[in-house]
Each structure stands twice: as C-alpha cells, then as structure tokens.
C-alpha cells in the first residue's frame, strides 16, 4: 500500500494536479484556465530558485504590459520577451525556462493577438507565439507554423536549430493535409525554401533533403548548395534512392546527377547516369569530358564495366585508346598482370580442387573413377578454376590427341570444347587460334562446342573486327540440320553480344523465335539470346515475336515443352529494370490462354523490379507461394509460377541489406511449409541473394538442405553453395563440399553438381566474382543478373537440364564473371604500383564530420583483390584518383600540390 500512496503523491506533484486544480478554480469562481494555472504556479513557487523566480516575475510583468491599453509599451515588452527566449541557455533536453514560464499565458496572448489591429506589433507578437507554440505537441495544433505564416519576419534562424526543425515537421504535416483537401500550398513551399539554407548551414543536410522531398520540390535543391555541402547532400540523396518508390527514385538520381555535374564530379555523375540506364545522359556525360583524355578513359572504364554499347567518333590515337577502354579490350591483359602479381599463373588441376586425399579414405577411390560423366565434371571444374588465365593442363595442351575432349562423349564433348571459351575469356585474339582447329573436326558436337567457345570468349569484350558476328551470324550454322549446332551458335551470339543492343542480329534471330516449324529448344534459345542482347531495352520487335509465339493457337503443344521457360525468360529480360513499363506486357499476357502465360507474367515482373527491394512486390510474390495447386492440366504451369515467385523474392531483395535479412527468414518458412516445387527453388533464391558473398548464416542453412530427402532440393542447395562462394576460395565451403562429395559418392547426379560447385567456389583461382553489383555495390549490372537468372531458371528443374544433357546452359554464368580486382594505372594506361588501404566499407551517410569510410584496414600495394563489402582508399595524396570509387581499373593522376619526402 505504501508504494501506491507514494505513487499517487508523485503523480500529484506533476501534471495531474495542475489539471485538477484548473477544474476546481473554474468551478469556484469561473476564472479562466490561464489564471487557474497562474495560481497553481504560485503555489509551486517555493520550488523555484531565486533567479528563476525573478525571470518568471519579469516575464509575467511583460505579459501584463501587453494586456494594458498603452500601446507604446507593447514593442519594448515584446523585444524584451524575445531577448529573454533567445538568450536563455538551458540544456538541450529540457524546455528553455522562458518558454516554460510563458506557456501558462499562451491562451491569453493568443486572445490578444486576435484583438490587436494589424501592424508591426501584431507581427512581432505572432513571432513570439510561434516559438511558444513549440511547447504544444498536439497532433491537430500546428501553432508554430500558423503564427510563423502570420509573421513575415525573415530571421527565423535566430530562434535556434530546434525551432527550425519543429517548424519543418509541422510544414510536412500541414502540407499533407492541404494536398488531401486540395487547398493551396504555395506559402508552405515559400517558407520551406527559407528553412533549407538554415538546415544546410547547421550541417543538417538530411533534414533539408527530407523537407524538400516531402513538399515535392527536390528539383529546387541545387541552387542552395555550395562546394562544402554538395557532397554530403548527394551522398544522402543517393543512399535514399533504394527506399523511394517510382518516380521519386528517378527524380532523386537526376537531381543528384545535375549537382555532381555542376561541381565537376564527372565519375560520380556517370555512375548515376548508368544507374538511370539513360543512354542519352551517359553519352552527354562522356562528351562533356572531351578536354581531358585521361578522364574520358576513366569514364570509359565505368561504362565498359556495365557493358553499355557506346558509339563515338574516333579521330586520333587518343580516341583509339579510349575506345579500347570502352570495349574492355585490355581486360585480359590487366587480369593476367594481377595473376602474375599474386603468383597464381600456374594452372591448377582438378585434383588441386577436389583434394581427394582429404575425403574419407573408404570412398576416396569411388568419387574419382574414370567415366565420361566424371570427365565432363572435370572439364567444367577446369573451365571455371582456370578461367581467364589462358593456360591449363587439360585442354590447351601440345598435342590434340591429349586433349580432354576425347574423354567425354555426346553433348559432353560440346561442353568440354566450350570450356576453351572460359579459359581464354576476354582474350579474343589468342583465343580464336586455339578454338579454330576444333571447328574443322567432323564430330558435330565438337563443332558446336567450338562455336559456343567463340561466343563465351567474346563476352563483355568488343572488337572492331567482330569475330563472333563473322563466325556465328552465318545462315548455314543457324539453319544447320543438327539442332545442337543451331543452339550453340545462337547461345554464342547471345553471350558475345550480351547487353549490346545490336540491331543487325535481329534479322538472324527474330525469325527463329516465331518460326512454327522450329523446335521449341531452338526457338526458346533464340528468345533467350535476344533477351540477353537487348536486356532492359524493351525492344518492341523481339517482344512482339515472343508474344506472338505465345498467342499462337497452333503452338500450344510446343509451349508444353520444357524449353518454353526460356521463351518466357527472354521476354522478361527485355523489360529488365524497367519497373512500371512492364505493365503493358502484363496486360497483353492476360490474353494468352495457355498455362505458360502466368509464369511468363511473373518472370517479366520480377525482371522489371530486380534489385529494387520493392516491398510490395515481395508481398505479392509471397501470396503466389501461399496458393495451393489443384491437380489438373495447368499444374505444371502453376508449379513453375511458384518457383519463379520464389526466385523473384531473392532477385528483388538482393539490392538491399535489410530486405535480405527479412527474405532469408521467409525462405525458412517456405522450406517448412511449401510444396516440393517451392522447396526446390528456395536454395536457388538463397544463392541469388548473395552471389560471391559467403555469409555463414546462409551457407549453414544450405548445408542442411544439401542432405534433404528430396534429391532435387539437395542438388539445388549444392549449386547454391557454389554460387554463394563463387570465386572466393572460402575454406569452410570447400570443406563442406568435400564432405558432400564423399556423402554422394554413389549418386552420379549429385556428385556431378558437387564438382560444379567446387569449380565455382575456386573460380579464377579465387580472383573472380559473379556478384552483379559493382562500383561500391551501387550499380546493378543487367547483363550479369540476366546470366545468373538464365542458369537458375534452368536449375529449377535441374534433372531435365543441367544434370542431364543440357549442362552447357551453365555457361550463361559467364556474363556475370568479372575480376574482383583493383588495378591502378597512370594516364597512359600503364600499370602503376601504389599503396592502398583495403578494409570493410563503412556506411557514413548522415554522420557528422568526416568519419573514416573503411574499418579494420590493411595496407597493400596494387594490384589487389577486393572481397565482398570491401573498399580501398589511397594511402597518401601523392596521386589523385580520377574515379570516385577505387574498384576495377582506376586511373591515377599525379597531385601537383604533393610535397612528399623531399
């Protein structure tokens, strides 16, 4: 009981009692609440210190003066009041004393305001009322703003930062109300534009951006910035983009782009132009740097990394060099210089990867027996492990008779010969000599493999001679009687020109898509190749051809083919990253009656929203996964529909860290309660969420799924483990995969997949990455994501494609393979060795001062490898980097102001 009585006493001391007293006074003598409060305050006056008591009396006297009839006293009284409020120094957490003492008189003063005639005194009173209004936090009373609008003073900043923030908050609330009621908002906008410079002055750029964003006037921002504030404002704006909806996200990027251009930050502007996927803007930015050849080369590297086909007039040697940068021709050379520096040029054998001696001795012999299937797996492992180095011990050997091709059979020969393409990746000039001899052999599978190899080695690289066009865009090969050669040629073209939007290829490929006589396998491959070449361009000719095929009554039976999913994927890729623009196609697909229509629509939608982290889309996809499928003729289509929805959840969430965390939890639920078709897709989606980023929580879960009772779930989990660790040499994953090799030593298909995963894990001897995000994880590469998606769509039914005869589909992943290196060059593109610090990137958005952008760093000399989430910065100021992010190929310029060690 004692406790309760104590509690009531403390409650009495505080607010509760004031309210009670107010009622009492009103009842007894009908006084106004303000007077009631005054008496209450007097009762409590014993608690005030002498100074406070004096201040309180002074302020009360000033209020009295305002109520008197002598108008000459008003001005000095108001000035004294303002002075008192402005000079009060109280702690930031408490309400300033003058406001505390004036609050009881607030109602009195508002009445006075209503009674006074218009004039300076009235404005001055409104000024004071606006400040006292801060002490009321009712939702419906925006008094601070109300009186601020009535008082035309310009000197808002003198009331302090807290007041300005409070005002901004109320502007936002009132603006939303006025928009809802269709009332004019111009005065609010004008006031907001007065507050923005005040925010920027006190380093609260986040508040400035938020206020302008809320009032939809973000385009006005650039005129308020200067050299000191623009970088922080842009950093905040760009990091907000992922959380905004269309079209605000695009507006923000465009405004930030214009700010960077204004302050000559060309590389940062270019990164945003690339994110906007606006070719006109990219060309304009590129042309703007024509005075500075070194800068143009740096911009060319950025454009080339994204695989954007940019044409420009070449008139001199400098232009030729810039074109080399723009078309990635030197990529192979720089990659090999990295290999030399890291001392890994020596080719690795499959045994170096399998490490059979570490597998349990009982089954060690059995996982390594010599069969065509095992040799095919070895071919893939060799292809991935030595990718890009141009040397190995199985394919590029002295005598043709020793070549590994002869140890495989049928389609296996095609995939093995195609592995030459990955070994010689990006090295077109030398590569063609090695592959050429295989095109003359009589075995058609080997010819097919050679054509595919030509396509693979040209991926992400362009040359003037266009060997892929010359060798593959050949009617004889595209109409060859053997469908394998047709498929290989089409796939080769799709890889070689991925993302290039090359119009000349339409005449070769579009007819194949819509030809009703053609087998579904070839048509679908042509659709996928077109999707790759025109990724994200919403090319109408290709989309019409694919939709016509879907609408065609006669091709109904063809659409039941397992290959028809690639027809759908081809359509989806055309709208990659297009967001709202995909709705046109979704409407068209509603007219298609075939069960393939729904899965196609979902594929198109997930491609359009890839990497955006759009929460509403993820919710829609989760709803699709919840539906129960009835048995019937539409069952296959519905099952694919749910599998694509699961992949889509991963694809959309991959761009944003918080979304990833949440989605990984959803995947756990889907694995518990989902049907078999959903469970098969979950491991693939988990791999897609963090490719080349082996997070322990993800691979531990996948390791559990890799022993699942459903063999297809296990196979997909094994592949996902490979994808998760692709190119990282992660020791824990390597150990898990070796254990799986022993566990599945009797199961040929699972063992084949374990080998593929081991090859992926050690890709490029640990120097490559398949993560589609680059340039400090800001930009999502369309081409890379499209390649990953093609492999994963095939993996949904692994036993019909990858582990049976269509294993060559794995080579679509080549579009995503890229060195995770930092190579520094001088202005003549010669490698330059400098010291850099490499550490974990730290998010510094909105932090005060100039915080460190990396943590836990080590100093290394370039060229260096960068892991996922790592960032590099130059150790000293001897050189200035022309690129805003140290990643990939970076040009350094000597700093003219550097003193150095003289």
Swiss-Prot record:
A GO CC annotation given for this chain: ascospore-type prospore nucleus
Superkingdom, taxonomy of origin: Eukaryota
Gene3D superfamilies xref list: Leucine-rich Repeat Variant (1.25.10.10)
Comp. bias (Acidic residues): 42-52
PC repeats: from-to residues: 415-448, 449-487, 488-522, 525-559, 568-601, 645-680, 681-715, 716-750
Keywords for the protein's UniProt record, in alphabetical order: Proteasome, Repeat
Gene Ontology molecular function: any one: protein-macromolecule adaptor activity
GO BP: proteasome-mediated ubiquitin-dependent protein catabolic process; regulation of protein catabolic process
Chain residue ranges for the region called Disordered: 1-54
Start-end of Basic and acidic residues biased regions: 1-41
Family statement drawn from the similarity comment of this UniProt entry: Belongs to the proteasome subunit S2 family.
Function: Acts as a regulatory subunit of the 26 proteasome which is involved in the ATP-dependent degradation of ubiquitinated proteins.
Name by which UniProt lists this protein: 26S proteasome regulatory subunit rpn-1
Species of provenance: Neurospora crassa (strain ATCC 24698 / 74-OR23-1A / CBS 708.71 / DSM 1257 / FGSC 987)
């Amino acid at each position: 009981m004692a406790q309760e009585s104590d509690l009531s006493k403390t409650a009495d001391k505080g607010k509760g009692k004031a309210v009670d007293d107010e009622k009492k006074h009103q009842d007894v003598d009908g006084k106004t609440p303000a007077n009631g409060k005054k008496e209450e305050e007097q009762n409590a006056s014993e608690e005030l210190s002498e100074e406070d008591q004096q201040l309180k009396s002074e302020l009360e006297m000033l209020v009295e003066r305002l109520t008197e009839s002598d108008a000459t006293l008003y001005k000095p009284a108001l000035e004294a009041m303002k002075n008192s409020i402005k000079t009060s120094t109280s702690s930031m957490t408490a309400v300033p004393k003058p406001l505390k003492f004036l609050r009881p008189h607030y109602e009195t003063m508002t009445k006075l305001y209503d009674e006074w005639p218009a004039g300076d005194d009235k404005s001055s009173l409104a000024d004071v009322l606006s400040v006292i209004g801060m002490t009321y936090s009712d939702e419906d009373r925006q008094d601070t703003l109300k009186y601020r609008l009535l008082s035309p003073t310009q000197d808002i900043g003198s009331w302090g930062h807290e007041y300005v923030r409070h005002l901004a908050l109320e502007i936002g609330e009132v603006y939303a109300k006025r928009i809802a009621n269709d009332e004019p908002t111009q005065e609010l906008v004008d006031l907001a534009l007065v507050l923005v410079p005040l925010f920027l002055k006190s380093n609260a750029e986040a508040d400035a951006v938020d206020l302008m964003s809320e009032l939809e006037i973000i385009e006005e921002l650039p005129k308020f910035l200067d050299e000191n504030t623009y970088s922080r404002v842009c950093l905040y704006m760009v990091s907000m983009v992922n959380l905004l909806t269309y079209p605000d996200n695009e507006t923000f990027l465009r405004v930030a782009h214009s700010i960077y251009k204004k302050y000559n930050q060309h590389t940062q502007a270019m990164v945003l132009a690339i994110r906007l996927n606006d070719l006109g803007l990219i060309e304009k930015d590129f042309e703007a740097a024509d005075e500075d050849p070194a800068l143009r080369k740096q911009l060319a590297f950025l454009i080339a990394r994204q695989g954007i086909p940019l044409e420009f007039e070449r008139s001199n040697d400098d232009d030729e060099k810039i074109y080399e940068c723009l078309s990635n021709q030197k990529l192979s050379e720089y990659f090999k210089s990295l290999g030399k520096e890291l001392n890994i040029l020596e080719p690795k054998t499959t045994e170096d990867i399998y490490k059979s001696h570490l597998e349990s001795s009982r089954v060690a012999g059995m996982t390594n027996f010599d069969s065509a299937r095992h040799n095919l797996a070895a071919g893939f492992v060799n292809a991935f492990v030595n990718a890009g180095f141009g040397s190995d011990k199985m394919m590029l050997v002295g005598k043709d008779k020793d070549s590994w091709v002869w140890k495989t059979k049928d389609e296996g020969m095609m995939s093995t010969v195609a592995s030459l393409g990955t070994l010689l990746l990006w090295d077109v000039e030398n590569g063609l000599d090695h592959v050429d001899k295989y095109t003359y052999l009589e075995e058609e599978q080997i010819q097919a493999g050679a054509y595919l190899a030509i396509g693979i080695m040209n991926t992400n690289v362009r040359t003037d001679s266009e060997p892929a066009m010359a060798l593959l865009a050949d009617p004889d090969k595209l109409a060859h009687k053997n469908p394998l050669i047709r498929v290989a040629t089409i796939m080769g073209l799709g890889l070689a020109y991925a993302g290039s939007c090359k119009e000349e290829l339409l005449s070769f490929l579009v007819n194949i898509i819509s030809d009703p006589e053609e087998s579904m396998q070839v048509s679908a491959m042509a659709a996928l190749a077109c999707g790759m070449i025109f990724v994200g361009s919403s090319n109408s000719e290709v989309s019409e051809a694919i939709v016509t095929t879907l609408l065609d009554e006669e091709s109904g039976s063809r659409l039941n083919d397992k290959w028809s999913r690639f027809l759908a994927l081809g359509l989806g890729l055309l709208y990659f990253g297009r967001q709202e623009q995909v709705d046109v196609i979704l409407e068209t697909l509603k007219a298609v009656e075939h069960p393939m229509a729904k899965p196609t629509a979902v594929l198109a939608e997930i491609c359009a929203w890839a990497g955006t982290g759009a929460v509403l889309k993820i919710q829609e996809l989760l709803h699709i996964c919840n539906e129960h499928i009835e048995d019937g003729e539409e069952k296959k289509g519905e099952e694919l529909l749910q599998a694509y929805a699961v992949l889509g959840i991963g694809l959309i969430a991959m761009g944003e860290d918080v979304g990833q965390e949440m989605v990984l939890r959803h995947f756990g639920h889907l694995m518990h309660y989902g049907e078999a078709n959903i469970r098969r897709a979950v491991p693939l989606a988990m791999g897609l969420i963090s490719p080349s980023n082996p997070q322990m929580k993800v691979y531990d879960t996948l390791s559990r799924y890799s022993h699942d009772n459903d063999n297809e779930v296990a196979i997909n989990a094994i592949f996902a483990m490979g994808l998760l660790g692709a190119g990282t040499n992660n020791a824990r994953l390597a150990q898990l995969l070796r254990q799986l090799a022993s566990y599945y030593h009797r199961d040929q298909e699972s063992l084949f997949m374990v080998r593929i995963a081991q090859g992926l894990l050690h890709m490029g001897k640990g120097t490559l990455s398949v993560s589609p995000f680059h340039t400090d994880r800001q930009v999502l590469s369309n081409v890379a994501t499209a390649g990953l998606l093609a492999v994963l769509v095939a993996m949904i039914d692994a036993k019909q494609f990858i582990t049976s005869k269509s294993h060559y589909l794995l080579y679509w992943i080549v579009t995503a393979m890229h060195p995770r290196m930092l190579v520094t060059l001088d202005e003549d593109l010669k490698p330059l060795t400098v010291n850099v610090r490499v550490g974990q990137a730290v998010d510094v958005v909105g932090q005060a001062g100039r915080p460190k952008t990396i943590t836990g760093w080590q100093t290394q000399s370039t060229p260096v490898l960068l892991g996922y989430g790592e960032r590099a910065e130059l150790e000293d100021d001897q050189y200035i980097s022309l690129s805003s992010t140290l990643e990939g190929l970076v040009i350094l310029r000597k700093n003219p102001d550097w003193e150095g060690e003289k």
